[in-house]
């Protein structure tokens, strides 16, 4: 949890230090945004490939400070400054992938970026956050067989049981059924059917 702006600054600095160990640093880059810009450019130059930047739970600092308007404004400013160089990094970036529970347009962090797309409810991407029936049957067949054996079921009975217990998520109007990966992998690990999401 980000209880103060210093915690966010420390987390950003720690991540940048990790990347700078890999891609190098420039002492003239004295702000988070300049450091990020430099890291992206050096990663591109060293690899010869455009960078993919993944930001998981980008909205976590904002949500943690939801009940403190002053802190939230400070955190929003830090994040806006940190992400501000991304638009100008187009030649070095292949894409930016953000995950979070808040719409990025509501966070006022990415106002510099006018080409972001919310893909969370688009058919073409509806299966990226879970496991499809085909993936379950092809990639996890051995897990299903072990689950069936542990529960005295046939393979087909285990598939039905798994579908009833962990299937049914839809992320777009025409989405195929998606299995919850957290619950599914916990079921495989423990060899039992349970409501892992709620425990």
Each language-model region and where it sits:
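Phosphate-binding site recognition
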Residues: 1-199
